[in-house]
Amino acid sequence: MSVLQVLHFPDERLRIVAKPVKEVNANIQRIVDDMFETMYAEEGIGLAATQVDIHQRIIVIDVSEDRDERLVLIDPELLEKSGETGIEEGCLSIPEQRALVPRAEKVKIRALDRDGNSFELEADGLLAICIQHEMDHLVGKLFIDYLSPMKRQRIRQKLEKLYRQSARD
């Protein structure tokens, strides 16, 4: 397994719409394993393949405190959503920035697991929010797209400053 490079906003590759996975095979399983390693190394709770410049519909999630409840979503499909909620979300592709994003409180999805088996999942709370956030990545959408133009611009300016400081270090 290896840690992959996470793309950072405003990299345009984050806007590429991911393609469906044709077949779950050893290559896809290796990508899943590398994505988990990357997500844990970056201290995230979710990662979409788009964020590591792999434009296939693959998501890995682990919202557990002990980091031992891996969830793999290949070709996820939203079946139902209900209620309204929102928390301050962050994103590995938008470092050190957080914003309140409106989300559905509960979701029901269908996806394939790491072995290519189809399953359905009903989720609420943080898991439901994380699923929605990562599914947005698969269609080229970022959490900042839910914000006003002024807030997006402010985040862009903060990131440019952060990147300049990182380049000097």
Curated annotation (Swiss-Prot):
Entry's EC annotation: 3.5.1.88
Q: Which cofactor does it need?
A: Fe(2+)
Question: Top EC class per UniProt?
Answer: hydrolase
Superkingdom assignment: Bacteria
Keyword line? Hydrolase, Iron, Metal-binding, Protein biosynthesis
Family to which the UniProt record says this protein belongs: Belongs to the polypeptide deformylase family.
Record's protein name: Peptide deformylase
Q: Which organism is it from?
A: Erwinia tasmaniensis (strain DSM 17950 / CFBP 7177 / CIP 109463 / NCPPB 4357 / Et1/99)
**Gene label:** def
